[in-house]
Each structure stands twice: as C-alpha cells, then as structure tokens.
Curated annotation (Swiss-Prot):
It is a multi-pass membrane protein. This is Fluoride-specific ion channel FluC 1. InterPro entries: FluC. Keywords: Cell membrane, Ion channel, Ion transport, Membrane, Metal-binding, Sodium, Transmembrane, Transmembrane helix, Transport. One of its GO terms (molecular function) is fluoride channel activity.
Length: 120
C-alpha cells in the first residue's frame, strides 16, 4: 500500500512540475532555468514542512517521497547546468548551481522552522 501511495503522490507531483514549468516558460526565457528552480525550491519547502509534522506513515509516503519526489527534479537541474556550460554561459551555470543549492536548503529550513513554530 505504501508503494501505491508513493506512486500516486509522485504522479501528482510530476503533473504539478509540468504545469509550473509551462507557466515559467510562458513568461519568456531569460537563459536561466527558472521553472526548474521554482519546482525544486517549492519541493524543498514542502519536504522541510512535512519532515517537521507528525504524520502517519501512509500520509508521509504520499506527500514526502511521492509528491515532493515527483515535483522536484535533480536530473533536469543537472542537465540544464550541463547545457548552460556547453553553451559557455558560465555565469548562468554557476548561478544555477548556487541558486538551487541555497534556495533548496534555505526553503527546507524555512519549512521545518515554520511548522515547528506553528506546532509549539
């Protein structure tokens, strides 16, 4: 049952990622992969918040590795960074690495802290 719940969550996460990437692409291109940055940051925020909640195992599987795992994308982040390097867009590539790392860790900490504050 846990595997099925994780798969359902992942399907919703992937659909949400697709919609957010389409919305970012519709706003125009700047050379920086904003869609991927947005989904990764949002996924880290949600994962941090979920980690701080006392959730039943089934809900944790659905929302954590399911929804957040389907929403975030390390492979696309890596591919886009390599593509930027191949195009000799060094500043964009290094900015992509730094922005994803800083925003992801910061968002996870913020999610955990916010839930912790509300639960006190």
């Amino acid at each position: 049952m846990t595997a099925l719940l994780t798969a359902v969550g992942a399907a919703f996460g992937a659909l949400l990622r697709y919609c957010l990437n389409c919305a970012a692409a519709a706003r125009g291109t700047t050379g920086f992969p904003w869609g991927t940055w947005c989904v990764n940051t949002l996924g880290c925020l949600l994962a941090g918040a979920l980690a701080a909640l006392p959730l039943p195992a089934a809900v944790a599987a659905l929302a954590g590795p399911g929804l957040c795992g389907g929403l975030t994308t390390y492979s696309t982040f890596s591919y886009e960074t390599v593509r930027l390097l191949a195009e000799r867009k060094w500043t964009h590539a290094l900015g992509n690495i730094g922005a994803n790392l800083a925003a992801g860790v910061g968002a996870a900490v913020l999610g955990m802290a916010a839930v912790g504050w509300f639960l006190r």
